[in-house]
Structures are given as structure tokens and as C-alpha cells.
A protein has these predicted regions:
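Metalloprotease/metallohydrolase-associated module, dominated by Zn2+-dependent proteases
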Residues: 2-3, 10-20, 24-61, 66-69, ...
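Active-site scaffold of zinc-dependent metalloenzymes
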Residues: 59-113, 121-124
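Active-site recognition of the HExxH zinc-binding catalytic motif
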Residues: 111-138
Length: 198
């Protein structure tokens, strides 16, 4: 009986490790594209997830010279919502992203998780300022949503929804700076009039 229990635990731990590595690999590809260099995304596994207190969504460390690390560490809840993004976006309730009113908690968490991956990718790109990273993240969140399975129109709607509904609720450090407008100093694609997705 004990041997069966040990085997069952080993299989479950192995399966969880495989899922975690698969998600990390998938998200690392997306983050690398946004960051413009090879980077890694680290989602906590089961054991680390038990002690994850949450708070900021993710983090990237910078050295004393302002150089970013090669890895972002995402919170358990963000990783879960990114892992579940494909299933969430297929639900009828996801169509609410095409509007400007709050969606269900599940959809809002999915939209936020996509934004967090986009935001942390900006830090991996070398952007230290939270406000500037947020501005750039809003402009690349549609690309992230597409890489996670959204068709282009839906991906643009995710970006527009976050900007209209969720961004005003963000902490002050993440408030969009003055240059974060179409044609502004932080516009990643100033030739395009399509804001925020370029």
C-alpha cells in the first residue's frame, strides 16, 4: 500500500513538473518575442505555489547597472490564468472584451494575466520604469493575446478592454505617462493611428 502511495505521489509530481516546464517554455517564447532577446518565464510549481503570497503579478530583477535579468518570475495565479487562457477565451462570456464594461472575474483575470506577461516582457527588454513598461505593455498586449490563441480582432479587443476598463484601476506607479498616447513619445508605432495596438 505504501509503495502504491509513493508511486502515485511520484507520478503526480512528475506530471506537475512536466506541465510547469511546458507552460514556462510556451510563455518564454512569447516573452522573448516581446523583449527582443532570448528570455525565460518562471512559473512556480506546486510546492512554491503553496507559499506564493501574490501581489504584483510578476517581477524582473535589474542589476546595479540597470541591466535586466534573463528571467521573469510570475505569480501562481497569473500562471494559472495564462495556462487557462485558451479555455477561457473560448467561453461565450469572453465576448465581453469587445465592450467597455467589466467582465466576469474569470475573464478579467485572463485579461490581466495577458497584460502581466506583456508588462514583465517590457522589463526584460530593459524598461525599468513601471509607468513606461505599462505603456509599452498596453501596446503589445494584443500580440501576446494572439500568441496565446486569440484571433487578431479579439486580441485587439483584449488590449482595448484593458485600457478602458482595467488600466484606470491600476496603482499609481503604473499610471500611464503623458507620452503614452497615439503619436506620443512612448508610441511604439508612431506611423500607425491604431492605438494602442499599432
Amino acid at each position: 500500500v505504501l509503495a502504491v502511495l509513493v508511486l502515485l505521489v511520484a507520478v503526480l509530481v512528475g506530471w506537475e513538473a512536466h506541465r510547469e516546464l511546458s507552460l514556462d517554455h510556451r510563455l518564454s517564447g512569447v516573452a522573448s518575442e516581446i523583449a527582443g532577446r532570448p528570455v525565460s518565464v518562471d512559473c512556480p510549481g506546486f510546492l512554491r505555489g503553496l507559499i506564493d503570497l501574490g501581489g504584483s503579478g510578476g517581477s524582473v530583477m535589474f542589476d546595479a547597472n540597470g541591466k535586466p535579468s534573463n528571467t521573469t518570475h510570475l505569480e501562481t495565479s497569473v500562471c494559472h490564468d495564462l495556462s487557462d487562457y485558451g479555455a477561457t477565451r473560448k467561453r461565450a462570456e469572453f465576448s465581453c472584451v469587445f465592450g467597455t464594461t467589466p467582465c466576469s472575474d474569470r475573464v478579467e483575470r485572463a485579461v490581466y494575466a495577458v497584460l502581466v506577461l506583456s508588462h514583465e516582457s517590457q522589463h526584460l527588454r530593459g524598461v525599468q520604469s513601471e509607468a513606461d513598461a505599462q505603456c509599452y505593455a498596453i501596446q503589445t498586449v494584443a500580440r501576446v493575446a494572439e500568441r496565446l490563441g486569440s484571433p487578431p480582432a479579439e486580441a485587439r479587443a483584449v488590449a482595448a478592454h484593458f485600457l478602458a476598463v482595467d488600466e484606470p484601476l491600476m496603482p499609481t506607479d503604473y499610471s500611464l505617462p503623458d507620452g503614452c498616447v497615439d503619436g506620443g513619445s512612448l508610441d511604439l508605432d508612431p506611423q500607425s493611428s491604431s492605438w494602442p495596438t499599432g
